[in-house]
């Protein structure tokens, strides 16, 4: 007699202890139980048979703790679930430990269990989750046993598909089998489920074999016939009123399983003279869930992947989706319930699959023309039905036919869309190529589709409008509408690309009808707000079709004039040093360009210009719903070039944005959006007309510029109210746009310095007063958080006010009347930061404001930089260092040489803080992110020092003792193969360093070793003595030679130049993702030759390349490329050379 396994008693005991909620149980004992059960699962190859025995015992018992047919007690449910999990573990993760005998034994035991429990027993008390869990386990056993061990695995289960004859019916055996068939289909075919599995080649081959054998053995036919039989019986019983709920559950489950089998079984099994009429009958059942599931089956049949086009067309004819769907669409049209919408969407999916299939044939040039024509003829009757689905106001229904619409418009675009002209600047456009014209029928179809899509853009009548704000907190209905609106817009734009005139006609008709109805006296009563908002939305998006935001978009220019305008813009761009013309270039090209100035107003308005004029004259800006007026303001800002050409309209536009419809609107969301739009208007509309209105405009907006510092409630005791108040979207954050706008406006009055100073004082005075009172309160009580927040807000407002002033060249700074006031603001900022330097939010605001003051007046603030830096440099948190380094880079770029002393003073303490942080252990993802960002930031900071010709800071008396350590640290980063970003930045630093510290007097005195062909325009400037950075002051090569650092050439030859070759050639280097690193190394090589001349070439040929075992002919070719190719070409050559070195 075999010994009884101790697991048979230990597992039940452990599960009871581990699952117990009895507080008297010793926690140590409970932990022992949990540890034991964990080991049972880990050693599933040894324990699975015991677990299977425990699960199966007591079969036929009425419930847990009662005796079954085998004379044993059925165990508790949670215990049996654990046992099945162990069995699943061995089946899924360790199937190889189960031999043929074990598989056969398990199979027979489970079949016997089902016979006892589900045929003659309590069916697990009807608990569906237990039935489903067993079905999953059987499916995993099936995949282990079929077809090699047990080819008839499914036959006992097929027998269970016979409809029950008992009353009330026992459907649990059928439901178990249906679930088993579903689990099998999902395992071997369902793409969604398969993505969650580790898909090996062996697994894919196994799944393919299982599908093939099921098909070849006829098991698919048996399964489908069994499932159809259950559905048939269920419908019959439900129509008779017998156990409707039980049968409805069975039919629903069977339809779901049938849907999972049909995609991969033989078409003849799923579609034949018996099944097709059965599907038709199901589609007309009164229960919508059955109809929806059947539509899914129908869609699968329509989309079935049949390779032969002729056979596929034949199948589509047999299915006749249009004839099937048409009456169903008519019957359900107007239904508002969610179930009806879901069913209609499922019908739309069928139609869409049908259309996509036909387009796939008609658009395939490899298919015989006759078949392509047949496919197109079959598609034509589907088009009116497509439009009906598109017009449904329940979003999921029109979205269901999106693939059909997309494919249809795609082929129309290819057939009818004019190609983009490949005209070079200054040349006349080439004559348009001849394209076939849209037939009247297709144009009418597109017109109908366009009309439907445009009307679908209107807000639903049952959805309450909300002003744009935090998109993350959008109401679900509004979010769904905006998503749907975006889909419709993409289709509208596609139609416009196919036939721009059609788009213009339809949009103009709808917009003009709406504006006329409103302007004729009907007002809001005649035009619902949804219709008015739609008209404004259409005008707003109209310009997107032309892709032209210049003034030419508003006028009908003759072709020759349009070309002349383009030439004028190009001349203006070249004359101003820009490479991209701006829209203002054709307004004023300067005194020497007056002959090229184009007077647009002499030409008739384009459709967009006409629509904008109608908007302006219709009075729609006074519509009493914020959605309409806000969209009107969006139009004003988007098409500002149009209004700038009509100065007489500007006072009205500003007045509208300033009144109760705009920044004074009672709706906070509208008001906040208008703050931004008003700022944009002020920034983009700087002309004489606006200059004359500055004073009244500022007077009108002054009450909106009162800053209220309100501390928000915190959600947890640890939450910092200051951080919460200053992050994310807030009212004050939007209010700051008004201060930027006021800066733009005050600057416009530059022709009258006295007036400008008065207006500047009117804006900045209250801000400085509020700043001062907040600082004083915080000085008296350092825990007064509201005072701290007040200081933050006023500093940010001052910064945004300064942001409204343009960056002025240093040579003009002395002429600025506002230099003194801004310097006073900077002084006030310093007083604030010296008192509140320990507050993170104040430091953040102070950095922003100070950088804006530096932009506005330049070098006069340079003398204040040391004081500012001294106040804050010791206070930074590790995460704040990154922002501080970016701040210093901004100052260096704006103030350039004026920051040398500050950076000299700052370098060592800054390096100390940086490396202290980087040397701390990384204990989590937050620290890892801080380390990565800080490393990138300090490397970018070092590079900026080099770019701004501040390289001398590294070798001052103060910093020179640490210079070697800095070089060593950076050099080590070039060897760090785990951090490609740092490698690239380190190589970039060294490529600049060889010019700064390694230029030899001999190379500077001799002719360049580079051939003329190697000189791009920038390279020629460099070879003549300039630096490689276009934004830095030019430093001649002779000056560089005088600054040459003795001994640095040794570092170049011994460390840097070898690293440029060896690092990317190393096997640890990721060559695929490291192309930019190799390019930086190539720049290092090239700059070394530039700095050292022939000496560097001789070193590479006679020493370095030989040590790298580079053949002499290859080495000579590399040097020849180096001295004759431009930098961008040599980067590619060097990359190819490195790849060859790696083999």
Curated annotation (Swiss-Prot):
It is found in: Nucleus; Cytoplasm. GO terms for molecular function: small GTPase binding; tRNA binding. Disulfide bonds: none annotated. Keywords: Cytoplasm, Nucleus, RNA-binding, Transport, tRNA processing, tRNA-binding. PANTHER family: EXPORTIN-T, EXPORTIN-T/LOS1. tRNA nucleus export receptor which facilitates tRNA translocation across the nuclear pore complex. Involved in pre-tRNA splicing, probably by affecting the interaction of pre-tRNA with splicing endonuclease. It comes from the Eukaryota. This is Exportin-T. Residues 576-593 have a biased composition (Polar residues). Residues 566-593 are annotated as: Disordered. SUPFAM superfamilies: ARM repeat. Coiled coil: none annotated. GO terms for cellular component: cytoplasm; nuclear matrix; nuclear pore. InterPro entries: ARM-like, ARM-type_fold, Exportin-1/Importin-b-like, Exportin-T_C, XPOT. One of its GO terms (biological process) is tRNA re-export from nucleus. Belongs to the exportin family. It comes from Cryptococcus neoformans var. neoformans serotype D (strain JEC21 / ATCC MYA-565).
């Amino acid at each position: 007699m075999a010994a009884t396994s101790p697991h048979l008693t230990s597992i039940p005991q452990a599960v009871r202890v581990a699952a117990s909620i009895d507080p008297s149980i010793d926690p140590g004992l409970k932990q022992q139980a949990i540890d034991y059960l964990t080991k049972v699962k880990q050693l599933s190859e040894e324990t699975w048979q015991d677990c299977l025995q425990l699960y199966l015992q007591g079969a036929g018992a009425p419930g847990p703790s009662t005796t079954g047919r085998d004379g044993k007690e059925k165990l508790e449910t949670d215990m049996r679930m654990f046992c099945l999990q162990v069995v699943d573990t061995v089946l899924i993760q360790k199937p190889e430990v189960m031999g043929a005998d074990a598989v056969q034994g398990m199979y027979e035991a489970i079949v016997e269990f089902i016979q006892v429990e589900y045929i003659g027993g309590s069916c697990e008390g009807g608990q569906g989750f237990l039935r489903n869990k067993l079905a999953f386990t059987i499916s995993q056993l099936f995949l282990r046993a079929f077809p090699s061990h047990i080819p008839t695995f499914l036959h006992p289960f097929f027998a269970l598909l016979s409809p029950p004859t008992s009353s009330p019916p026992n459907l649990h055996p059928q439901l178990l089998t249906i679930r088993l068939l579903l689990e099998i289909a999902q395992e071997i075919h369902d793409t969604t489920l398969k993505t969650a599995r580790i898909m090996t080649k062996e697994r894919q081959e196994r799944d393919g074999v299982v599908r093939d054998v099921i098909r070849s053995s006829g098991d698919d036919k048996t399964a489908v016939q069994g499932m159809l039989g259950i559905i048939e019986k269920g419908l019959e019983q439900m129509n008779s009123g017998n156990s409707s709920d039980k049968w409805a559950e069975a039919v629903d489950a069977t339809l779901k399983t049938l849907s999972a089998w049909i995609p991969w079984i033989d078409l003849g099994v799923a579609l034949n003279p018996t099944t097709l009429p059965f599907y038709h009958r199901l589609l007309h059942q009164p229960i919508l869930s059955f109809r929806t599931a059947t539509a899914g089956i129908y869609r699968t049949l329509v989309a079935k992947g049949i390779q032969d086009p002729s056979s596929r067309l034949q199948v589509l004819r047999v299915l006749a989706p249009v004839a099937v769907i048409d009456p169903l669409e008519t019957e359900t049209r107007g239904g508002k319930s969610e179930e009806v919408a879901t069913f209609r969407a499922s019908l739309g999916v069928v139609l869409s699959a049908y259309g996509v299939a036909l387009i796939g044939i008609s658009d395939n040039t490899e298919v015989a023309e006759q078949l392509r024509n047949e496919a197109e003829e079959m598609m034509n009757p589907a088009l009116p039905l497509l439009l009906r689905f598109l017009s449904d106001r329940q979003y999921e229904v029109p979205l269901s036919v999106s693939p059909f619409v997309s494919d249809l418009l795609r082929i129309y675009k290819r057939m009818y869309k004019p190609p983009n002209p490949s005209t070079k600047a200054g040349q006349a456009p080439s004559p348009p190529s001849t394209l076939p014209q849209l037939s009247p029928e297709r144009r009418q179809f597109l017109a109908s589709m366009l009309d439907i899509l445009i009307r679908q853009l209107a807000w639903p009548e049952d959805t309450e409008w909300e002003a744009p704000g935090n998109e993350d907190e959008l109401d679900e209905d509004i979010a769904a509408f905006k998503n749907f609106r975006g889909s419709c817009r993409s289709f509208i734009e596609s139609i416009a690309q196919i036939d721009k005139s059609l788009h213009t006609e339809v949009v103009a008709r709808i917009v003009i009808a709406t504006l006329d109805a409103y302007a004729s006296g009907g007002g809001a009563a005649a035009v619902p707000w949804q219709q008015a908002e739609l008209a404004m939305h259409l005008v707003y998006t109209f310009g997107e079709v032309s892709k032209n935001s210049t003034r030419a978009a508003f006028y009908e220019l003759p072709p020759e004039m349009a070309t002349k305008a383009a030439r004028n813009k190009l001349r203006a761009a070249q004359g101003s040093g820009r490479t991209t013309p701006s829209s203002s270039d054709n307004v004023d090209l300067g005194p020497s360009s007056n002959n090229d100035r184009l007077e647009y107003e002499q030409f008739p308005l384009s459709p967009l210009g006409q629509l904008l004029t109608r908007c302006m004259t219709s009075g729609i800006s006074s519509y009493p719903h914020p959605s309409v007026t806000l969209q009107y303001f969006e139009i004003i800002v988007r098409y500002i070039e149009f209004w700038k050409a009509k100065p007489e309209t500007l006072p009205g536009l500003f007045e509208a944005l300033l009144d109760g419809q705009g920044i004074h609107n009672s709706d906070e969301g509208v008001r906040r959006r208008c703050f931004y739009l008003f700022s944009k208007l002020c920034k983009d509309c700087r002309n004489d007309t606006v200059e004359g209105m500055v004073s009244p405009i500022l007077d009108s907006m002054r009450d909106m510029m009162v800053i209220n510092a309100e501390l928000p409630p915190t959600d947890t005791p640890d939450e910092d109210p200051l951080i919460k108040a200053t992050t994310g979207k807030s009212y004050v954050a939007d209010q700051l746009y008004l201060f930027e706008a006021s800066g733009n406006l005050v600057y416009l009055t530059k022709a009258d310095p006295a007036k400008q100073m008065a207006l500047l004082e009117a804006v900045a005075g209250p801000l400085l007063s509020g700043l001062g009172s907040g600082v004083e309160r915080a000085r008296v009580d350092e825990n007064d958080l509201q005072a701290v927040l007040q200081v933050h807000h006023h500093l940010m407002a001052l910064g945004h006010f300064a942001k409204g002033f343009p960056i002025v060249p240093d040579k003009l700074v002395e002429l600025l009347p506002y230099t003194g006031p801004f310097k006073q603001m900077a002084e006030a900022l310093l007083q604030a930061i010296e008192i509140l330097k320990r507050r993170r939010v104040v430091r953040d605001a102070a950095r922003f404001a100070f950088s804006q003051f530096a932009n506005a007046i330049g070098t006069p603030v340079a003398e204040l930089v040391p004081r500012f830096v001294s106040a804050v440099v010791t206070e930074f948190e590790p995460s704040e260092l990154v922002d501080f380094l970016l701040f210093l880079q901004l100052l260096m770029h704006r103030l350039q040489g004026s920051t040398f002393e500050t950076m000299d003073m700052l370098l060592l303490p800054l390096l100390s803080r940086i490396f202290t942080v980087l040397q701390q252990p990384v204990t989590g993802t937050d620290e890892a992110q801080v380390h990565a960002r800080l490393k990138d930031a300090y490397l970018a900071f070092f590079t900026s020092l080099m770019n701004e010709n501040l390289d001398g800071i590294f070798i001052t008396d103060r910093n020179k003792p640490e210079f070697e350590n800095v070089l060593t640290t950076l050099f080590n980063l070039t060897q760090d193969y785990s951090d490609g970003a740092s490698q690239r930045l380190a190589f970039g630093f060294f490529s600049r360093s060889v010019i700064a510290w390694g230029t030899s007097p001999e190379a500077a005195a001799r002719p360049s070793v580079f051939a003329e062909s190697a000189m791009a325009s920038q390279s020629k400037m460099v070879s003549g003595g300039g630096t490689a950075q276009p934004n830095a002051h030019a430093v001649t090569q002779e000056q560089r030679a005088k600054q040459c650092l003795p001994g640095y050439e040794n570092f170049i030859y011994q460390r840097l130049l070898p690293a440029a070759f060896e690092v990317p050639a190393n096997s640890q280097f990721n060559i695929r993702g490291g192309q930019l690193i190799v390019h930086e190394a190539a720049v290092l090589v090239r700059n070394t030759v530039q700095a050292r001349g022939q000496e560097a070439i001789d070193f590479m040929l006679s020493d370095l390349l030989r040590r790298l075992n580079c053949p002499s002919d290859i080495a000579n070719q590399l040097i020849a490329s180096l001295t004759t190719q431009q930098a961008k070409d040599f980067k590619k050559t060097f990359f190819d050379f490195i790849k060859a070195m790696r083999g």
